[in-house]
Every structure is written in structure tokens, then in C-alpha cells.
Amino acid sequence: MLNLRFIGPTGCLLAGSLLLGGCFEPAKPKESATEEKRIRLAMLQPPRSGLTPLSDDAFKLSRWSNAETLVVLNANGDAEPSLATEWQQIDDRRWRFVLRQGVIFHDGSLMTAQSVVRSLSAAIHAAPKPRILDGVELSIAAEGDSAVVITTAHSDPLIPQRLSSPQLAILAERAYAANGVVNPLQAGTGAFVLTEINGTSSARLNRFDGYWGEKAAAPGIDVSFVPDSNARAAALRTGSADLVEALPVSQLPLIDARLIHEVPMPRTNTLYLNTRLGAFRDPAMRAAAAAAVQRQQLVDNVYEGRADLAAGLLGPALPWAASLRQPQPAIQPTAVKGQTITLATFSDRAELPEVAVYLAQQLSAAGFIVKQEVREYAHIEADALAGKFDAFILSRATVLDSGDPVAYMYSDFACRGSFNIAQLCDPKVDEALTQAAAIPAGAQRRQAIIEAESRILATHAAIPLLHERVLQGEAVAMQHADRDPRERRLVTPRSVISAGQPRS
């Protein structure tokens, strides 16, 4: 029975193991060895917008295999079929998508071309728009009963990749209220149907027997939202949860190592150098700073070994990057003679001020006089973008919703980039980014991206330090949970609690 209830957010935040047992697993008869077991999932962030897919909550629906998009991305970031089985570019501005036949929404209604038009039109006209549509003008129309045509204002080779964003999920008509509110309850197409949203405390999903694809192995998912990192770790340690997001490094010594799984993230901890003002206007001085950086010390001491040394802007979460990367010519460093620099970062991510301390020591050892500036992000971003610091440490996502790094590179390193902390304006970099942006997704575009990365790194405007990992907790009995760097998949149709295996 459909049940929409709202319960206060504090119910699942207590760290005591007895209370956690009640939070994650309501009292019920003891399970037999052969009984199907529901997956108990502890997530980091509670819903921010009532699980509307037009917000970041869409990624939760995707991670639960509840709401689906027309296409999905493979490990290389290329589009693959989902609710659309094929697509073609008709001309520079039009794309045709053929829809999968026989797809049933969780309320029993049939997915049609009009269903797709309704869902995507809601996203196109939403305020604010989903991130993936920022700066993108497009329209959609049905072509008969089995296809849709998307028309863009300008040529856009990444339309299929854009449509993979969880914020562009296709939902049943019942999800869309006249006032613009989108309610995903019993409205998706995925392997699990969402039946309960209990405010910011929990959610419940059941297996959907009418699913068009592989039927779910597990009978359902019981989701608890647990922002307290120690409470999430305790839930895994005590067997109160089967699957846990974002384990804190500080709790790892208390947890069986078999339950801990590291997932590389498309996020690079980067030192940006101001190329317009101050000591780092000189490329040779930037090269001196790059030569002073000791990445291994940061990985070992700040991240306790649970990060990857950066060889470029793009890390192991984009597995194609390393094999394409070529050695680049190095700028000869100049001698450092007591130049004073201001090194800044923000305190919202707890590890960054510690990174700043180590970098300050390394740069001081190279001859710089280093002043440090640490504030909350909201109070430092404007100054960073205005070029008021010589160096700035940032943990930066390198792919956005399209799964493609060109947008990140343009934003951070193009002359007209909107997030150009390094104040870089290099014609060779702009040329490389423009060329990469015009190429359709695939091997040729990936090669062009690496060439653009090489030109950026040659300027020493950015010194990539390390690539972050997230720690995912899985009980011994938890089988086939997805370890997805893009955080789009977690519980899949294959995910299951193995019979006869302990849950802790």
C-alpha cells in the first residue's frame, strides 16, 4: 500500500548500537536461511527536495534502480541503450531517439512517446533547470508512438550523454502535479518501486515484477538516511546495515577489512596557481612550485593511503585517460629567492586545511615565504575567482552530469571560463578545448581531451595532487552492489543478500 509519511530527521542519527539496530532493521520474525532478505541501505545525505528528480535527489532514485533515463553511460562515458534502444543525429541540431517498447511504469501505465515528452519538458521548463541543461536550449516532440525528436538551438554532440543524467529520468504522468511538484512515488520504470518516503529519515522500495529488464534478485530495499558518519560505520560494524555509503577513514580500524571497498572518484585535489598576478605570473616560478610538491606525503599523511597520486587532471575514475596520456615537455624551474605567496583553501572539506599545512611546508622548503588563508567556502570563493590569492587548493569534480570532462576543463582553464581560479588565458589551451568540444563522443574525443589536458598541464596553472576515493561498506552477505565512480548506480537488479552468509 502506498504510504507517504513525514517523520522528524533525528530518528536515525544516534550512534548507539542498540538504537541503530532499531533504526535499520524494524522488529520482525527471525529470517530463515532460505528466506529472501531485503537490502538495508544506509545513505549519507537525506533528500533535500522530497526526492524530486529535478534536484540532486535524482541520484538517489538512480542508485536505487528506481527511476531510469533514455540512455546510460558506460565506463568510457559513451551512451548505451536504456529506455531508448537507438538514436541518430538527423542534422546539426536534431536527434531522434527510438523508445523501448512494452515499458510499464510502476503505477501500471505504459510508457509512450508522450510520457517522454512530458518528463523532459518538465525538466526543460523547471526553475532552476537541472545542471545538465545549464546554458542548453532545446525542445522535444513526439514522432508517432515510438520515438521522440530533440531539437537544440546550437549543434551539441553530447545530447545522448546529457540524456543520461538522473535528473532527466522518465516518470509516469501521476508524478507531475499542476503546481510543478514532481512526486516519484510509484512513478518510475526501474527494477524497484518506491512505496514510502518517510521525510528525511527513510524510504522503502519493493521489487517491481513488471520490470522490462532483468528482475531484481532482492525483494526490496530499506533505506535509512544517516548523515552522522560514525553512526553509518557503527551500522555496518554491528550488522544493522548491509550496504553503507561513505565510511569515514577514522572508523576504519574498527571495521572488518573485508567489509571495506574503495571506489575511485572523478574528483581531483588540485593546487591552482594565479597566472595573472603575483609570483606565479612567471611560468618558471610555477614550475618551481610544481617541482616542490611531494604528493606521496599528502596521500600517506592526510588521506592515510586511501587516495591515488595524480599524474594528470583526470584520474582512475576515468580508466581511459592514463593509457592515452603522453610525457610532456617540462618548463625549467627558476630559482626561488624568498618570494612571498598566499596559499588559500576552505574548511568545509576537513582534509583541505591539512593539505594546506603540508603544502606550505613543502613550498617553504623550496624557498617560498608562505602565508596561509583558510575560510569557509561561502566566504572565500569570490576572492579565489577574483585572483586574490597566489595559490588555491580545491577538491574539484572533473566530470559533471554528462560524464565528459570538457565542461570542467573549459570552466576552469579557458580564457572565458566561469571558474578560472588560475586566471589562465592561453590561446593554445583555448584552441585545444574548442577542438575537443566539437568532436562527438568516442575515442577521437577522448584523445582530444587528453591533448587539451596536456596543454593545460604544460602551463603549470594547475598542479594535480591526488585523486580521491570514497569508501563503501558492504556486509559479507551483500553481493553485487555496484561500485560506481559516478555515483549513479548502487543497488542493481543483481544485488542480493546471499542465503546462508552472515550479514556482518
Give, region by region, the residue ranges found by the protein language model.
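Surface-exposed binding/hinge segments that line
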Residues: 88, 94, 131-174, 196
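Alpha-helical secondary-structure segments
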Residues: 112-119, 147-149, 190-191, 218-220, ...
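N-terminal lobe/hinge region of extracytoplasmic solute-binding protein
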Residues: 42-91, 121, 185-187
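Long beta-strand-rich cores associated with HINT superfamily self-processing modules
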Residues: 472-504
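Structural transition elements
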Residues: 304-337, 347-354
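Extracytoplasmic/peripheral linker and loop segments enriched in polar/acidic and small residues
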Residues: 24-25, 371-372, 377-380, 410-476, ...
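Gly/Pro-rich hinge or "lid" segments in bacterial periplasmic/extracellular proteins
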Residues: 163-216, 220, 230
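Ligand-site clamp/hinge motif
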Residues: 208-253
